[in-house]
Amino acid sequence: MTSDKNINLWIEGVQGSGKSTLLQELVTMNPHLKVCREGDYSPVELAWCAWMNKEQYEAVLARYEEISEEIKKYTVKEGDRFIIMYTRILTDIPGFHRDLEQYEIYNGRKKYEEIKNIVISRYKAFRDTGYVFECSFLQNLTEDLILFHEKNDEEILELYQELFAALDKET
């Protein structure tokens, strides 16, 4: 791979296929790349992250006051939303991860139109380059569309055409 900073790379694949190994090799060879692994903050993907409004965020900080600084450390504010990389927080507080899991957008937690709007708006807002994304385009969204929204191949392809158009900097 060249050291071109004007591209983004998307690594997809089934579990155990070597995605993380490939990602690490790419970053070793191209240290300028910004890495978005599953569970990290990503400008396009919300898997393994809690996505909440201000009231929900403040309630979580109050409920888990003893680790509120750690929560803040793993939070990114994006518009009027707060994104917590909660799976990165190591704690032995019973139920913490399960509690924050309810704020994820996947696994049937959002209606189809809502998840579609969230995902498309994030892709439209993303205009940066120099990223390498792990499991950020196909895996989590496709799984959600099939398992929880019962979308057929044509409906899934239509949404991905919209997402691809949103990423196209010429449109």
PLM regions and their residue ranges:
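Conserved substrate/cofactor phosphate-moiety recognition/catalytic segment
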Residues: V27-T87, D144-L145
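Phosphate-binding P-loop
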Residues: M1-N6
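Hydrophobic anchor at the beta1->P-loop junction of P-loop NTPases
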Residues: I11
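ATP-binding Walker
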Residues: S17
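ATP-dependent NMP and nucleoside kinases share a basic, alpha-helical "lid"
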Residues: Q102, Y106, K110, E114-D128, ...
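P-loop (Walker A) phosphate-binding loop of NTP-binding proteins
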Residues: V14
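Walker A/P-loop
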Residues: S20
